[in-house]
Amino acid sequence: MYILGIETTGAFASVALVRDGVTVQEIHGSDRFSHLQNLMPQVEKVLKDSGSTLDDIDLIAVSAGPGSFTGIRIGVSSARALSQITGIPCVAVSSLESLALNAADTAAEETLICPMLDARRQQIYGGGYFIRDGRPVEEV
C-alpha cells in the first residue's frame, strides 16, 4: 500500500511517500511558512524522485493538528483537493498521535508517552497516550 503523507502543521512543510510501512521518499521544506508556494511542488518531487505517479497512491494522510492554523488549512485543503480529483481516500492524522507513534517503537508496554509541540506565546500543545501492542491507543 502506498501512502502519500502531508505535514504542514509546523514552520516547515514536508511530504513523504510510504510503501508498506517503509519510507520510500521524503522531502522537507527549507523555507519557513512557505507551505502555499511549496507544498504541491514537494508532492510532485516526491512522486517523481520515487518513480511513482498519483495512480500508484492508495491513501493520502494529512496532519490535522494541532499546529499552525494556516498551515493546517493549506495541508488539509491540498490533500482534499487531491483526493477529490483522483478518488484516492484521504485521512486526517493527529500531529500528537503521530509523535507518540514514533516514540512507541522504543517504549515498553503501558508506557505513558506525552508528546508536546510549541504553540507559541509561551504555550504548548500536548497529549498523553498509553502504549499497547506497540501502538499509542489510549489518549488521556
Features from the language model and the residues they span:
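N-terminal beta-alpha supersecondary unit
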Residues: M1-A64
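Surface "functional belts" at beta-alpha junctions
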Residues: V22, P89-V140
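Short, well-ordered alpha-helices that flank and scaffold nucleotide-derived cofactor binding pockets
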Residues: P41, R80, Q84, L101, ...
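DPxDG-like acidic metal-binding loop motif
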Residues: A61-C90, S95
